[in-house]
Every structure is written in structure tokens, then in C-alpha cells.
């Protein structure tokens, strides 16, 4: 099953309405912290935009992501704040809410691919978004300042080429400003407007 045409219509309207992103405020359970390296952040919040392009579809919308070591809350919204997709993971279970329906699976990647048809490397995104690499990644070029310019990530289906198109200072650390992730069947762009390292509040 694929995402309904209504979701893609909302997303395409969003492209026409895109405005500069406003500041994201950490959720009430977390406090912002400063780090010297993004790897030091055990949890973070991101506000930005994501665009997915395949041979069949084009999709672009706002992105909010609360990432923790064992849990995630990822939301796609219109510029007016309407949520069109929510993906949550916790304790080995993934839940996807879209088009008024809820789907569950033990594997978030399989769930998203099965429902949306998008082949997105979810497991690797938290690393790439913060300028880090995984065990399947090979850096092929650097920028003059030492930040990563491009890497290749091995995947059984087809390798991913990840281009870091800009870097910025956020929460005291250097993190990518714009990522382009592509292989022959899909192109993904993620723009980070604000990245905040956070820590759970002491109760």
C-alpha cells in the first residue's frame, strides 16, 4: 500500500507555501545543552525540511525529529502545522500514523517502505544528520576545513551516496546544514534549520 494521493497533494501545496522555519522549543521533558561534538548528544531535536524524489513521486514538507538512544518521534507537517505523517519508535516497536490510519511493525524501515513506498535509510539518518558515519560508510572526500564532503554507504540493494552540502554551528557543535542522499531509485534532501542537543530533565 502507498500513501494516498491526498498526502502528496498536501505536501506539494506545502512546497508552494514554504516559509523560513521558526525556532524549535525543546519538549517539556528535555532541556537544551551545549556540546563540543554532536556525538556527545544522547538526545536531540531537529526542525527542518525533507524532500523525497523517486521516479513516481515527489514529496517535500517540514520535518520535526526528536531522537533518543532507543526512541524516536518523527513528524512531517505542513507550513500551517498540520501533521501529515508521524513515525514513532520505542522499545523495538514502530508506529506509523498517516491518513487517519495507524500501522505497526517491529522494524521502522520496513514499516515506512511498505506503507509509503519510500526507500529511506532510517537507521543511518541520525548519524548523517549529525555528521557522523556508521560501520558501512566510507568517506570519499573532505572539505578544506576537515568536515565531511561526501561518503558512500554500503547497502545490500544499492549503495547510498551521501553529500554534505553545507555545515553550521548548532548547540556548540558542527552539524550538516544540508544533506543530499541518493541512489538510482531515490533522492532525499534534508535541510536542518535548527538542531538542539538536549538532556532529559531530572525529576
Swiss-Prot record:
GO terms for cellular component: cell outer membrane. InterPro entries: LolA/LolB/LppX, OM_lipoprot_LolB. GO terms for biological process: lipoprotein localization to outer membrane; protein transport. Keywords: Cell outer membrane, Chaperone, Lipoprotein, Membrane, Palmitate, Protein transport, Signal, Transport. Residues 1-21 form the signal peptide. The keyword Protein transport applies. SUPFAM superfamilies: Prokaryotic lipoproteins and lipoprotein localization factors (SSF89392). Its main location: membrane. It is a lipid-anchor. It is found in: Cell outer membrane. It comes from the Bacteria. A lipid is attached at residue 22 (N-palmitoyl cysteine). A lipid is attached at residue 22 (S-diacylglycerol cysteine). HAMAP family: LolB (MF_00233). Belongs to the LolB family. Monomer. Plays a critical role in the incorporation of lipoproteins in the outer membrane after they are released by the LolA protein. This is Outer-membrane lipoprotein LolB.
Amino acid at each position: 500500500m502507498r500513501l494516498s494521493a491526498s498526502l502528496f497533494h498536501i505536501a506539494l501545496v506545502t512546497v508552494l507555501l514554504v516559509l523560513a522555519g521558526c525556532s524549535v522549543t525543546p519538549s517539556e521533558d528535555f532541556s537544551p545543552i551545549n556540546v563540543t561534538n554532536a556525538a556527545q548528544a544522547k538526545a536531540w531535536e531537529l526542525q527542518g525540511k525533507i524532500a523525497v524524489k523517486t521516479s513516481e513521486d515527489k514529496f517535500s514538507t517540514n520535518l520535526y525529529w526528536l531522537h533518543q538512544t532507543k526512541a524516536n518521534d518523527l513528524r512531517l507537517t505542513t507550513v500551517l502545522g498540520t501533521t501529515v505523517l508521524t513515525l514513532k519508535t520505542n522499545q523495538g516497536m514502530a508506529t506509523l500514523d498517516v491518513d487517519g490510519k495507524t500501522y505497526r511493525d517491529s522494524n521502522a524501515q520496513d514499516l515506512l517502505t511498505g506503507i509509503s513506498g519510500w526507500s529511506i535509510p532510517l537507521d543511518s539518518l541520525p548519524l548523517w544528520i549529525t555528521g557522523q558515519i556508521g560501520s558501512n560508510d566510507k568517506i570519499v572526500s573532505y572539505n578544506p576545513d576537515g568536515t565531511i564532503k561526501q561518503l558512500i554507504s554500503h547497502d545490500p540493494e544499492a549503495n547510498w551516496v551521501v553529500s554534505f552540502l553545507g555545515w553550521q554551528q548548532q548547540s556548540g557543535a558542527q552539524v550538516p546544514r544540508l544533506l543530499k542522499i541518493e541512489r538510482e531509485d531515490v533522492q532525499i534532501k534534508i535541510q536542518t534549520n535548527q538542531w538542539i542537543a538536549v538532556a532529559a530533565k531530572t525529576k
